[in-house]
Design a protein with these regions (language model features):
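Short hydrophobic/aromatic beta-strand or adjacent loop that forms the aromatic wall/cage
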Residues: 33-35, 129, 177-181
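Active-site HxH/HxHxD metal-binding segment of metal-dependent hydrolases
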Residues: 65-133, 137-152
Length: 296
């Protein structure tokens, strides 16, 4: 190398400096219950726990906006946390327009296929506690636990009986026994944590050394206070927090904007580098990674 050819950097070049650069990491919207729709960086679409607000047993008010099924677009992947009706009932509506991979626990995969007429070829049955590689993300599965409904297992499926479709009752009977949480690692290395139900010890243990996911979806229990929710999220770890299953409320926490504000105040008071965001139903949002110049 001829060192005489090296010149110093020109700090004031003719080409102006950039003031900002942005990478769109993820698009998402909340639909109902634990149903979120994600558009991944490569354009593929992931849907969690398909249950739309127009379903017969949905917790809705007179002014609750319903989803336009035509607006869903092509769904590539569906994940199912557990098999209660409010996590799977909208599957037939999706299969009228798409042919997604349905990722669910192998324990109830047969009943899911039978109850909703899903071809076995479309179902990817997993074993809890394992890792899986899909074309568009890596998936880690964690054993979860449903909240206590104080019920015993109904072998005949009478608790959720459907006179026109007997398989639905039996499918629902698995719902409180088999519950799975997830970590999605996108091809960009962005991570989405899905934490529903109770008894999250194995999930917390797995995530504690990595600081938790970039985006945490955490179930807001029906009677949960902002303090309880904030402290549970802190124990899980993560950066951005989105609520799920907050369609079911009690009078004290029906204002989710106030709930979110109170949770963030607790995060700030605890000096926790975590923030909660309450998405408006059906509205699209974008998570960006960006660099921007500080104001002078």
């Amino acid at each position: 190398m001829n060192l005489s050819n090296i010149i110093a950097l020109n700090d004031y070049p003719q080409t102006p400096y950039q003031e900002e650069t942005v990478i769109n990491t993820l698009k998402f919207r909340w639909i109902h219950a634990q149903c979120y729709q994600f558009i991944l960086p490569n354009g593929k679409c992931l849907l969690t726990d398909p249950f739309f607000p127009q379903e017969e047993k949905a917790w809705v008010r007179e002014n609750t906006p319903f989803l336009d099924i035509e607006d869903l677009g092509k769904i590539d992947y569906i994940t199912i946390n557990h098999s209660h009706f409010d996590h799977v009932q909208s599957l037939p509506k999706i299969f009228k327009h798409s042919s997604p991979i349905v990722i669910c626990d192998r324990i109830f995969a047969r009943e899911l296929s039978a109850a909703y007429g899903i071809q076995e070829f479309n179902i990817f049955p997993f074993v809890q506690g394992q890792q899986y590689h899909f074309e568009d993300f890596y998936l880690e599965t964690y054993i979860g636990k449903h909240g206590n409904l104080k019920m015993v297992c109904d072998l005949n499926g009478n608790e959720f009986k459907d006179e026109y479709n007997p398989a639905i009752g039996k499918l629902n009977s698995y719902g409180s026994l088999f519950n799975t949480n997830f970590l999605f690692r996108l091809l960009t290395n962005f991570t989405i944590g899905f934490a529903a139900g109770v008894k999250l010890d194995n999930l917390k243990e797995s995530w504690k050394y990595g600081g938790g996911p970039n985006l945490l979806l955490r179930q807001r229990m029906r009677k949960e206070t902002p303090k309880e929710f904030a402290e549970e999220c802190e124990s899980i770890g993560g950066q951005l927090v989105l609520p799920m299953h907050h369609d079911a409320c009690c009078k004290e926490n029906e204002d989710m904007n106030l709930f979110c504000k109170n949770v963030n105040e607790i995060f700030i008071s605890h000096q926790t580098p975590m923030r909660m965001f309450n998405p408006e139903r059906l509205k699209w949002y974008t998570i960006n990674l960006n660099i921007s110049i500080e104001g002078e």
